[in-house]
Amino acid sequence: MALVLLLAPVAPALASQVLRISAIPDQNPERLNRLYGLLASELSDQLGVPVKYTPVVDYGAAVTGFRRGDLDLVWFGGLTGVQARLQTPGSKVIAQRDVDAKFWSVFIANQSSGLKPFSDQQDLQQLKGKRFAFGSESSTSGRLMPQYFLAQVGVTPADFASNRPGFSGSHDATLALVQSGAYQAGALNGQVWDSRLKEGKVDTKKVVLLWRTPPYADYHWIAQGNLDQRFGLGFTNKLQQSLLSLTPSQPRQKTILELFAAGRFIPAQASDYANIEAVGRSLGKIR
């Protein structure tokens, strides 16, 4: 009886532990809520713990929430992931999609801009004087790497119309703004572009693909370093394996992978993002 009384307070404490997952808000909220709601259910079933998806208002909030310990597992872009990891000692990169080692951005334009597709990076200079939109200010594929490729050919943010670019906040928003003509051109996640094109959400009479960038590493999962202490020895490895084991042969897992636009998840490590860190420092996004 004494043993039962001694252990009784422990069980509720363990049961109260919730794995809090989140992600940068890079696409429309409805799509993200569906994706991470499904993923939370899948992880909860596999791990045997409650899993809650907590949406954030912007990219910076994802980094801040992770740094403060309010979020346990976050789907970051390349830049935000590096920022979050450097600000959170002990945190660990655990996975990326099969497409993330060689990711890419696209530059698009409204047909009325007069801009035409090109294969030479030097032709990015044609964007000077145009109304141009990036995505989020902290987006890797929607801002950091496009700005890097622009800088390589001598195009700075001050070269755009009104001496500054616009920031749409997400890839879907950039596409919508360029398609509507509010901006003459913009840059966004290449995979989002390809997906929306396939889904029939791009009006090719209004929008043209100008250029695809060279590849770079991008999105990845980062976990807090204290998960084994909170959920039990080996939990972080079990969490990683749960992500790596997602397969199209299971209906719910297939939907999750499709929403991630991935064939599967693969292992990743911090060194995979060394180039992103270097570019981030060169453009003043990491200090």
Where are these regions (language model features)?
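Ligand-binding cleft/hinge of the Venus flytrap
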Residues: 38-47, 141-167, 197-203, 278-286
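Short helix-initiation/N-cap motifs at beta->coil->alpha
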Residues: 53-64, 77-79, 157-176, 215-217
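A conserved helix-loop-strand patch within extracytoplasmic ligand-binding domains
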Residues: 97-153
